[in-house]
Amino acid sequence: MNHTPSPHMTEAAKSGAGLLCGLGLGPDRVRSPDSLTHTPSPSGGTPSSSPPLLLSPGLGCDGIGDWESREELRLRELEEARARAAQMEKTMRWWSDCTANWREKWSKVRAERNRARDEVRQLRQRLDALTKELTGARRERQELAAENEQLRLEAQRVRAEQSSPENASTAPESISSTASTHSNQPREAEIKQDNQDEEGVRDGPGSPEQEPVRDIGTDKLYKQKEMELLEALLRAKSEAPDSWDGRSASSLRSALSRQDRNRLLWEDLAALEEDTSKLNALQLRLDESQKVLLKEREDKHALIKNIEKLEAELSQWKLKYEELNKSKQEALKQLNLLKEVHQDELGRMSEDLEDELGARTNMDKKLAELRTEMERLQVENAAEWGRRERLETEKLALERENKKLRTQMEDLEEQLARKRRQAASALDTDLKTIQSELFERNKELADLRHVHSKVKKQYQEKMAELTHANRRVEQHEAEVKKLRLRVEELKKELGQAEDELDEAHNQTRKLQRSLDEQVEQSENLQVQLEHLQSRLRRQQNPGLFGKMRTSASSRFGPEDADGPPSDPDEDEEEELQLQIP
């Protein structure tokens, strides 16, 4: 039986030969189907000691059905694997989109937080600068108050010198008293106004609306008193010569000498000039102090407006901080939801991995079964090969016997012809015997031919079985190759899934770290905001300054009273430290 193999089947036979070589069969035992045409004939000589293993490309009906069912199963598994891969790609894309959205949100929140931190830092710097300016203004106001007190004492001393019992008369005393009253009234008004301003500053931003009304009224009173003071000074200057004339007349009426009168006159004139120069200097200093007080009032109003602006900005920042807290809570809720979804996805992925591992174990079991079946087929093939060798030897023996019988028949025919020529009479009897012998020989030859045909049929059946076994072996080899490729693909997909799972874990860790950093930064902002609120409360408490002064006066003895004035902010901080346990 000669088969014409196709090139595809020859390639399959070559791959099967490589597989059989790997299983322990040598290349001399593997031949293509076209090698059957070169099998030795009985007349060509004896066969080789290593018989070929025939790999026929044909397939049986059972093999075709199994192959189609397995192919359908493989296609179904391939479609399921593709669907799982597409689902995993979708989930990973969704995760990447979610992480990108979260990164954008966190970047926006971080930018807003940095912006808020910068604005809070700027507000803090402005607040520090304003507090420094306020402390400087308080010090200058205290210094001006001390200077005003000194000027008032000097004016009182000048008035006391003018109203001395030696040289004073009733008119100058009345003028000086009116002038002193007029000069003391605006100073007392200034001192009251300063005290009211200090109380207004201590009251803080809680009462900024009453300040302008009080300042307008006091400015009007202050201007009226200033005009009255200037009129009194002009009257005193105009009435001074008349009073001195009265004094000279009274002195002339006395029993003093002219030299004494001249000396007293010159002394009075010198004292008057000194008093006028002192009054002018005091008036200039008073004008300067008034200008400084006006500037201080303007600075105070500007500071109050700045404090109101800062409070408005602080309220806005509080609202922004509350919004940030709300957005942070929403982000935490969304993050928890994402964590739950991620845990569900991880559970599904773990289930898929377990399914893949189960499929892999099933594939390993199938491979083990195929290996055992292949080994069984190899054993059967070896047994069939032994049977074939035995049949071939029997065939060769029968052919030799046929040759011997043919030679014997030829010899018998020659003897028969010779006997026919030698004796005609004996031919009949001999012919009968020879015919009987020939009939027996022909019968034996027919039996031998019948046996030969049976053996040949058995040989053909065994060859067909062998070709079928070779086809099944080729089919199993192709299935083994496909299964190996499938196992490699599954290994690659498993490695990719593990890498994607590790990336997802790393992304969740990064998100958790960024969340912890945001929480720490929000806590730092909360601490800074509480510190600012405590400082604003310290500035808004008006009763603390009185407590500080009393504590400072009780802390320092009478010998320290003449020392430099202490900083109210430092005293305030010390008082707060004493009050807070």
From Swiss-Prot:
SUPFAM superfamilies: Tropomyosin
InterPro entries associated with the record: Myosin_tail
Biased composition regions of type Acidic residues, renumbered to the chain: 559-581
Coiled-coil zones: 70-164, 270-541
Polar residues bias (residue ranges): 161-184
Disordered: region residues: 1-61, 156-219, 496-517, 534-581
Keywords (A to Z) from UniProt: Coiled coil
Biased composition (Low complexity): 39-59
Annotated Basic and acidic residues bias: 185-202
Pfam families in UniProt: Myosin_tail_1 (PF01576)
GO CC, alphabetical: myosin complex
Designated name of the protein: Coiled-coil domain-containing protein 102A
Species in which this protein is naturally found: Danio rerio (Zebrafish)
Gene: ccdc102a
